Design a protein with these regions (language model features):
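Beta-solenoid/beta-rich acyl/carboxylate-transfer cores
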Residues: 68-80, 84-98
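Alpha-helix boundary/capping detector
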Residues: 32, 36, 40, 67-71, ...
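Terminal amphipathic alpha-helical/low-complexity segments used for targeting or macromolecular assembly
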Residues: 1-61
Length: 98
């Protein structure tokens, strides 16, 4: 299930962004996608008794993507952060599907 959600995250630009121009474009030009994927890992560890590891992953992701998502936040499926720089999502936030 976890990897299926990651695959969905990687496919969102193609589905939702008219400026999408290929997978390499996602790799280099979509920090929101990478912030979300990093969050999925951080959230997993944060909610499985490894809060410290979730916080470390979240901190590194914040530095690399300029997107600050607390590892305790809940983010649904099929979410796409276009132009994500500067997004801040707190620990108690719940972002639904789609």
């Amino acid at each position: 299930m976890f990897w299926k959600i990651i695959k969905e995250d990687l496919s969102q630009p193609k589905k939702q962004d008219p400026a999408y121009s290929g997978f390499l474009d996602v790799v280099f030009n979509y920090p929101g996608v990478w912030a979300l994927i990093n969050h999925r890992f951080a959230h997993f560890f944060f909610t499985h008794d490894l809060k410290w590891l979730g916080r470390i992953i979240s901190g590194i992701s914040r530095i690399l993507t300029a997107v600050d998502i607390h590892p305790g936040a809940t983010i649904g499926r099929n979410v796409f952060f276009d132009h994500a720089t500067g997004i801040v999502i707190g620990e108690t936030a719940v972002v639904g599907n789609n």
